[in-house]
Design a protein with these regions (language model features):
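Gly/Ala-rich beta-loop-alpha elbow adjacent to hydrolase catalytic centers
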Residues: 1-5, 9
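Alpha/beta-hydrolase-fold enzymes
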Residues: 9-98
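Active-site nucleophile elbow and catalytic-triad environment of alpha/beta-hydrolase enzymes
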Residues: 102-122
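Short beta-strand/loop motif that positions the catalytic acidic residue
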Residues: 126, 132-134, 138
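Short alpha-helix in the alpha/beta-hydrolase fold that links the catalytic acid
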Residues: 128, 141-151
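Catalytic histidine neighborhood in serine/cysteine hydrolases
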Residues: 147, 151-167
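Catalytic active-site module of serine/aspartate enzymes centered on a nucleophile-bearing elbow/loop
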Residues: 162-184
């Protein structure tokens, strides 16, 4: 599972451990990159926005999907220009791929979900091997939260991927070879 799917996957493993033999979590969202802003301040701001009926508004510097917008690759979550352009073309052609920024309600739900992952009662239920693929240059999720998860579970291993962004599977060829070798 990747990113937000890693959050959902972690919660499922905690709630229904009997359905899983092992898991690979790729740059899992076990915490959000809050850009150095303390979580209580973010929560207060998000709750205020929701209180003023702005839950459906885009949070902070996020925005809706803009078709055919050219984003500089250095601002993306990958460094492979070919893979970036391929995914960009897919997103432009298919309305179901046209997701983009987070709303205040999404941030609120994400903070709640990532907090639930770390409840001690839930963590104790995890009894399967878990492999976390951690991207050094992840600008969307918190690698520190992934480290915390690994420390608090008995059978979690982290594969640290240096110089790699959040979209690990869209990285350059040299990284992907090491990535797939490690996983398979």
């Amino acid at each position: 599972a990747h990113s937000m799917g890693g959050c959902v996957g972690s919660l499922l493993i905690e709630e229904y451990p009997e359905y899983f033999d092992a898991a690979i979590l790729n740059a899992p969202m076990m915490g959000i990159n809050l850009l150095g802003i303390p979580k209580p301040i973010v929560k207060a701001f998000v709750n205020a926005a929701i209180g003023f009926n702005k839950g459906a508004s885009f949070a902070f510097d996020h925005q809706e999907f803009i078709p055919n917008e050219k984003v500089e690759i250095k601002k993306s979550s990958t460094k492979s220009k070919a893979r970036y352009l391929y995914v960009s073309d897919l997103r432009n052609e298919n309305i179901y791929y046209q997701t983009n920024g987070a709303t205040f309600s999404w941030v609120n739900a994400a903070l709640e979900a990532t907090g639930n992952i770390f409840k001690p009662k839930q963590l104790k239920k995890i009894n399967i091997p878990i492999l976390i693929v951690q991207a050094e240059k992840d600008n969307l999720v918190s690698p520190k939260a992934q480290d915390k998860f690994a420390r608090r579970t008995e059978n979690t291993k982290i594969i640290f991927m240096p110089q790699v962004e959040h979209d690990t599977f869209n990285s350059k060829e040299d990284f992907l070879q090491a990535y797939y070798f490690e996983l398979f």
